[in-house]
Amino acid sequence: MGRSVKKGPFTDTHLEAKLMVLNAASEKKVVRTWSRRSTILPEFVGHTIAVHNGKKFIPVYVTENMVGHKLGEFSPTRTFKGHSVKAATEKSSKPS
């Protein structure tokens, strides 16, 4: 279930406050945050937010298409190394 429309979108207050200060001064600094749970608001468009993925900060440039999504969606936490090639070598090594 999604969040109630009555409540409105959730964003951490410290993140929203930092971006409002940057908007008022019309600055474009990179803002570092651990708040992957925050919803992207229209006021965030045009800013670069460095989102923590558990190991390092991934810079995310916010565009209009991202509004309504969570910051964590754009900072992957897992790296896919690929499946093992063991099954492929077993098939090719069988004598015919």
Curated annotation (Swiss-Prot):
Transmembrane segments: none annotated. PROSITE patterns: RIBOSOMAL_S19. One of its GO terms (cellular component) is small ribosomal subunit. Gene3D superfamilies: 30s Ribosomal Protein S19, Chain A. The keyword Transmembrane helix does not apply. The keyword Ribosomal protein applies. It comes from the Bacteria. GO terms for molecular function: rRNA binding; structural constituent of ribosome. Keywords: Ribonucleoprotein, Ribosomal protein, RNA-binding, rRNA-binding. GO terms for biological process: ribosomal small subunit assembly; translation. PANTHER family: RIBOSOMAL PROTEIN S19P FAMILY MEMBER (PTHR11880), SMALL RIBOSOMAL SUBUNIT PROTEIN US19M (PTHR11880:SF8). Protein S19 forms a complex with S13 that binds strongly to the 16S ribosomal RNA. Belongs to the universal ribosomal protein uS19 family. This is Small ribosomal subunit protein uS19. It comes from Solibacter usitatus (strain Ellin6076).
